[in-house]
Amino acid sequence: MKKRFFTAWVLLILVAVSAWSQQAKYVFYFIGDGMGVNQVNGTEAYRAELEGRIGITPLLFTQFPFATMATTYSANSKITDSAAAGTALATGYKTKNSTLGLLPDLKTEVSSIAVKAQKAGARVGIATSVSIDHATPAAFYAHVPSRDSRYEIGKQLISAGFDFYAGSDFDRPTNRKAPEEGTLYEQSEKAGYTIVRGYKEYQKKARKADKIILFQSEEASKRDRGSIPYSIDREKGDLSLTEITRAGINFLSKDLSKGFFLMVEGGKIDYACHANDAATTFAEVEDFDNAIRVAYEFYEQHPDETLIVVTADHETGGIVLGTGKYDQNLQALKYQRMSVNKLSDKLNELRKKTDNKVTWEMAQQLLGEHFGLGNPLKLNKRQEERLRKAYDENFKDQEAAYDESMYQKDERLATVAKEIINEIAMVGWMSGSHSNGYVPVFSIGAGAEKFCHRADNTDLPKKIAEAAGWE
């Protein structure tokens, strides 16, 4: 009897060890740009308030079985930028701010986990909600001293030869100094890439494509080639991060025997945080979670061979959930129906429509309709005076007053409206830039247990390589 029990116990251990040590064949690496701990916590608390209760309503990825946090400092600064952080997350090496794929000497190239996957025979995809040559996606294929070398980064994207790319567009598709080289679109097609615009065109052309680049529509790029629209502003036909993720999985799954690596960046979380736009930030985090859900559905079909890792490159804005009182009113943000940038556009449209003869009553109506200010959100005297002063600055002269953040320029009245709804919601911001806060790390699947101790951002690609056998 004892012998049988011992044999059964040994078999149980062997089965457990076998499951525990299963290599990851399909790897998802989700990076929420600017998504610190409070961006995640704030989103979940906001969701709970919308349900009329105190607490949190969890996102999908925060329910993954393994969770930890990571440090983010760069080689030359306590506060990283996205290039240095992206390089750390992609290669496992620290570098200087603004640098991509190079050591701090700005000469020595370091390979990313995506390149290691490619060399191991896996199919590779790099995707983002901003331009495909932006810092985070570029860290997986480019080697340049300056993240601003967008055209050169685009050329290196092509030479990297990954199977799938997706983003809003190329930020700088031409080289004015060498027009004979042709555009990056032409160079991509010459290298064997099929370029598609929008998810519907992807569905039509993906099956016959050997390698593919998915961009938003040309019309959308004319409005803003630097990113797809915020989820809170999304209209019918706009490309979404969920569609991008679904396309990536679909394309890389053409030959599942090879396995794959797919990095997906939620790039517009960072944009919203730079603008200190709480409602838009929480909407972007939730949209990021929706994209992760698509990968999770794949995981459910291949649980023993799939690894999903979710993290961030840094925190942006120094968001504070509480501004003095022992309370919050996050539910007020539900009345903000568009980003501050979109509200700025609405004000500009009103100016053009009225030949700059916008009355205070017209402005009030717009603020109430799109931000709920005045109705249903009651304003105190100081808040009303701030809005009226911003209105005067905006419409008394022919030239409107603007406020600039990292990625957008907003009319003063829109900026003040955003500040007031943040105030009503009791959300504070310390800056319009990055901070040195920890970033969260969540994981599930084959090798996920490797991500259960406090880490540095350089540890993550090393652990992924170990889990997948791509060392």
Residue ranges and their predicted role:
Residues 19-23:
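Boundary at the C-terminal end of the N-terminal hydrophobic targeting segment
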Residues 25-26, 35-41, 45-87, 134-471:
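A post-motif C-terminal structural segment
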Residues 1-9:
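Bacterial N-terminal signal peptides that target proteins for export
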Residues 8-18:
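Bacterial N-terminal signal peptides
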Residues 93-162, 169:
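Extracytoplasmic mature domains of secreted/periplasmic and thylakoid-lumen proteins
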